[in-house]
Amino acid sequence: MEIEKLIAALEETITHLQKSQSSGSSNMSAEEIIRKLEVEISKARNAKPTDVYTLELLFAPTGVIQETSIDNGWGTRFLRIAAVVDEFIGG
């Protein structure tokens, strides 16, 4: 997978999170999630290894991003984005 595709997926996630309220069922605020994603984007842009474990946790089913996306009406978009991240993690 091209790293640009992962970066685009993470940036799209940030765009949605910036418009979202933190989920009451999540143990992490939208702002905290954004900070973690920005770190991973920076690593990817600088040809450094991304933290696969962090991405797995953030994008896991019933994880913090999915909970936030459902609570804010972009759950279907999350599934599409998560598929890109899963492709990266699996590859």
Positions of the model-derived regions?
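Short terminal alpha-helical segments
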Residues: 1-30, 82-89
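Alpha-helix boundary/N-cap detector
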Residues: 1-8, 28, 32-35, 53-56, ...
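Amphipathic alpha-helical interaction modules
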Residues: 16-63
